[in-house]
Amino acid sequence: MADHDPHVRQRVVLLIDGLGWHQLRDRTAIAPTLAGLAGTVITSVAPTTTATALTSLTTGMCPGEHGLVGYRMDMGSSVMNTLRWGDERGDLRRTHAPADVQPCVPFMGVKVPVVSKAELEDTGFTEAHLRGSTPRGWRVASSIPVIIEQLLAAGEPIVYAYYDGLDKVSHERGFGPHYDAELRACDRLVADIMASLPDGVALYVTADHGQVQVGGNILQQPTEVMACVARQSGEGRFRWLHARRGAERDLVSACIEVHSDVAWVVTRDQILEEQWFGPVVRPAALRRLGDVALVARDDVTFDDPADGGHFVLQCRHGSMTPAEVEVPLLVHVAQR
């Protein structure tokens, strides 16, 4: 890979949110630039969700260490949406300081320039996984290659760029013409970045997760399960159920009886034993986990009435199926 190429002087990491290996492999004809790059398939983290995976990328730590163990986390007093860094009452930065919730230093303390949406700069999640970096916000995607080119010309050894268009389209529209059009746009974006790179710069393209089309396959929890549940966290395809006091065993039995045909029903102890979140799980991170995880195996999602939105998500992620967990790591080294 380019890390061992003595020709490489600078590096750019571009993360395309939601660009799964399987989705790209099935659409190489509409993404010729991406399809033509050298590279391989790598695996994301558990759960395959943006907050968890991006934080592992920027800190180099497994979820059990950095502590952002899901999209919605049980923080004791409430369940916090990690991307919004809030709950139904609003922003939680005063009570849950990002640097306390996620204590690992991003980028090993190096002040890396981050090329991401300008509107994301002043958020709790940005503070949690990008603090100490230098924000270089963009308002339209066409600015991304321009900003990267300027940073490289200024001598920056590493540039990190993030683009979320593909993830947004797949959530709202699913796989189809809108997704394909956005994948073409991503391919053009990568081509434009490659064209702007000076000699000796390596470009790495990767992702946080893939997607599966779920649509209206939304499963409600039956009475025998909810009778054992105090609250829920996580997300639809990696749903944590937190048991009522004394109901832990009954919850496991009920979930196996009802959901084992479409999901992996996994206890917290099993997840720890099998190191789903890495070999080390800090006590604070452990407290954020539920008692039982419903990890979708089929193309379904598990509903939580407290985790709603403005529209039904067509594509989802979070589980550990190949379509969600396998992502590309593609490399291009500019040689002029």
Name each model feature, range by range.
Residues 1-336:
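Feature captures the catalytic ectodomains and active-site-proximal regions of enzymes
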